[in-house]
Amino acid sequence: MKKIFSFLLVLTVVFSFSACGKKKDKAAENKVDLEYYAGLGQMPECDYKLGADPDEMVEKLTAAESSAEAAGDEYPFAVTEGEKTVRIDNGDFVYYYEKAKKDKGISYIIATNKGYGFEGGASILEIKNALPELEYTEEDVNDSNSFFLMGAIDGSVLKYTFKNRVISFFFSENELTAVTLYDTDNWT
C-alpha cells in the first residue's frame, strides 16, 4: 500500500512540474505568416485575392446579393466607378482595380473588420509584438496612403513590404481601423 501511495505521489509531482512554464504567449496567438500570404496575394479572411477577375467577382457578389434579398437578408454590395479606378465593396472587404489595368485583376484589397487575424481595434503595439521578426516602416496617415478612408483621420500606418506586395495596418487613435494588401506592379 505504501508503494502504491508513493508511486501515485511521485506521478502527481512529475505531472505538476511538467505543466509549469507552459504559458501561452499572447503574441503567438496572433501570429500569422504575412510573407506567405503576401506571396499568395490574399488575406486569410477574404474570399478573393489579388489578380482576381473583377467581372467574375461582380457576378458572384451580385448572385450573393440576390440570394440574400430573396431570403430577406441584407447584403451590402456596391460597384463605384471613378475616373481611373473601380471600387467593389461588399461591406467587410473593399476591392479596387485600375481601369487601364483591368486585365491584371484586383490590385488593392481593404479589410475593414479583420485582417491577418487582427480584429479592428487592435493596438499598434499588439501588431508590432506579434510580428517582431519582420521589418516595417511606420508613417503618418495621409491622403496618398489612405485614399479609401472617408474623411481625414489622424493616425499612423505600419507597412510590411514583400517584393511587389505591401501589407499595411492603419491606426486611428492607436486602434486598428483597416488592413490593406496591394500589388505595387498593378497599383499606382
Where are the regions that the model predicts?
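Positively charged n-region of N-terminal signal peptides that target proteins for export
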Residues: 1-4
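Internal alpha-helical transmembrane segments of multi-pass membrane proteins, especially GPCRs
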Residues: 6-9
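C-terminal motif of bacterial Sec signal peptides marking the signal peptidase cleavage site
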Residues: 16-19
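Bacterial signal peptide processing site
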Residues: 21-23
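Post-signal peptide N-terminal segment of mature Sec-exported envelope proteins
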Residues: 28-43
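Second-shell loop/turn segments in exported
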Residues: 41-48, 111-119
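A cross-family detector of function-defining hotspots
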Residues: 52-101, 124-178, 184-188
